């Protein structure tokens, strides 16, 4: 998407890019020009791709913790999708992976480990931006509980979650509450839905897992106020 601003009417909004590849190449060429690197008249074009002719020019590797931290702290959808496809590659290592492989991996874990019927839920991407994802608070809570009881999962997950009033997508929330510096949770929002899920320590020192999903939300700000109040109560 590209942000659009109209000075005359003081309007700011977002529009979808019709062809993202054209936008990418146009922006890429513009950045090259800014660095003094110019190209000819015919700057770029599409060409047919033969599968056997695909070659890897370079590989960039990053520790999974770095990708996880950016996916959670900054709510980076690209990092979330990358982890989704990485999971898919582990689940189906012998062919070119697709989103269905990632969905199958999640469904298998959901059924064999958590004991939930995958037919009752629907997951179509790794970032959660699709309106065709359907899960329940109870299912998400079971994932959080499973992570807590497996320290090799919990420790990097806990460190990567935004901290209320401190950083990430929760940097400006719950600042004047008991939840500040205590709640570690992931935010989520699509049209009409706002969510918050993670961990909070109660006054007795016990670690609590919680999931809040508000549906049919007209104003996301109101849902966030509600979520923040719940977190404040859980912290007391």
Label each PLM-derived region with a short phrase:
Residues 1-4, 8-155:
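A small/polar active-site loop signature that marks catalytic segments
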Residues 84-236:
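Small-residue-rich helix-loop
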């Amino acid at each position: 998407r590209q942000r659009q601003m109209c000075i005359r009417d003081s309007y700011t909004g977002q529009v979808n890019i019709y062809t993202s590849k054209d936008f990418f190449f146009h922006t890429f060429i513009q950045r090259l020009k800014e660095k003094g690197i110019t190209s000819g008249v015919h700057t770029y074009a599409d060409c047919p791709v033969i599968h056997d002719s695909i070659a890897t020019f370079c590989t960039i590797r990053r520790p999974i913790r770095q990708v996880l931290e950016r996916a959670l702290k900054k709510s980076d959808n690209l990092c979330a999708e990358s982890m989704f496809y990485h999971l898919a590659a582990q689940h189906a290592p012998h062919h070119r992976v697709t989103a269905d492989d990632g969905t199958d991996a999640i469904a298998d874990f959901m059924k064999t480990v958590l004991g939930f019927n995958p037919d009752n839920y629907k997951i179509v991407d790794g970032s959660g931006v699709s309106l065709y994802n359907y899960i329940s608070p109870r299912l998400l809570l079971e994932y959080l509980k499973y992570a807590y009881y497996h320290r090799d999962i919990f420790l990097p997950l806990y460190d990567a979650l935004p901290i209320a009033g401190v950083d990430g997508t929760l940097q400006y929330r719950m600042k004047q509450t008991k939840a500040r510096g205590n709640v570690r949770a992931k935010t989520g929002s699509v049209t009409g839905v706002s969510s918050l899920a993670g961990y909070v320590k109660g006054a007795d020192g016990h670690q609590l897992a919680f999931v809040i999903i508000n549906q049919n939300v007209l104003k996301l700000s109101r849902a966030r106020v509600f979520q923040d109040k719940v977190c404040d109560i859980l912290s007391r």
